[in-house]
Amino acid sequence: MLRIGLFLLTNLAVLVVAGVVLSLLGVGNYRTADGLDLTNLLIFCAVFGFVGSFISLFLSKWMAKKTMGVQLIEQPRNADEKWLVDTVVELSQKAGIKTPEIGVFAAQESNAFATGWNRNDALVAVSLGLLQRFERDEVKAVLAHEIGHVANGDMITLSLIQGVVNTFVMFFARIIGDLVDRVIFKNEEGRGIAFFITTIVAELVLGILASMIVAAFSRYREYRADAAGATLADRGAMIRALQRLQAEMSAGVESPLPSSMRAFGISGGVRNLFASHPPLEARIQALRDSAHG
């Protein structure tokens, strides 16, 4: 899905900018003559860590529309758009959620995403490439997968996890900054320039490493969304859709999107730690195994 990349990038940007501004303003009374007041520091980091995460959440739908150039379907202009709207309405009713906004975006890559700050204020969009090359039952399965994300409340859960991660990134970055300032630069009178620079660098590094935790949750939720696609639509169609995506990627179909924003990426080695999606073959096998479970 596209939303994981957008969410992480927005969140990291908000976190770093907030950290810089707060440090320059001297906000946060957590440094005393005896060192850091860890309790006050943790409270301070939790407040601003969750603020950054939820700002990213509330901006996610707007950013997705602007970044991907999504054209909303308010009144279907042809039979394909009418089928798309009718299908999303049907799947939403099955999932027990309000019908999300529906849109398409001009990309030849087979892709789709869902985003939004809650189950009843979401957006589902598909690429023109997917609509043109996939069979309708396969498109329906992909849409069911995305509706599954919305129904499962994945974006809210992701925001809560990201809020916890942000809290500890800010917390440990400031501890590292304080240690460098006091121990290496021997600054005992307030925060020196070493504290500010070290804290910003530590936030960037720790933020990137912490993204592995968020990516691990994202991989887990992909399996759940695949299961939702199989339940709301059809298991066989869900498997065929993944196989078609796998074939396209194996054939080297060019993607205009960065890897973090692709709907169904394949990665290996260390890249798996940062991948927001499991390998396609693992997802296909999980669907097959669940059919016999």
UniProtKB/Swiss-Prot annotation:
GO CC annotations on file: plasma membrane
Q: How does it sit in the membrane?
A: Multi-pass membrane protein
- A Pfam family matched in the record: Peptidase_M48
User: What EC number(s) are associated with this protein in UniProt?
Assistant: 3.4.24.-
Q: Which GO terms describe its molecular function?
A: metalloendopeptidase activity; zinc ion binding
The cofactor required is: Zn(2+)
Q: Where does Zn(2+) bind?
A: H145, H149, E222
Chief location = membrane
Q: Which UniProt keywords apply?
A: Cell inner membrane, Cell membrane, Hydrolase, Membrane, Metal-binding, Metalloprotease, Protease, Stress response, Transmembrane, Transmembrane helix, Zinc
Cofactor mode of binding and number, as noted: Binds 1 zinc ion per subunit.
Which residues carry out catalysis?
Answer: E146
Q: Name one GO biological process term.
A: proteolysis
Annotated compartments: Cell inner membrane
Transmembrane ranges, per UniProt, are: 4-24, 38-58, 156-176, 193-213
Q: Which residues form a coiled coil?
A: none
Q: Which family does it belong to?
A: Belongs to the peptidase M48B family.
> Under which name does UniProt file this protein?
Protease HtpX
At the highest ranks, the source species' classification is: Bacteria, Pseudomonadati, Pseudomonadota, Gammaproteobacteria, Cellvibrionales
Recorded name of the encoding gene:
htpX
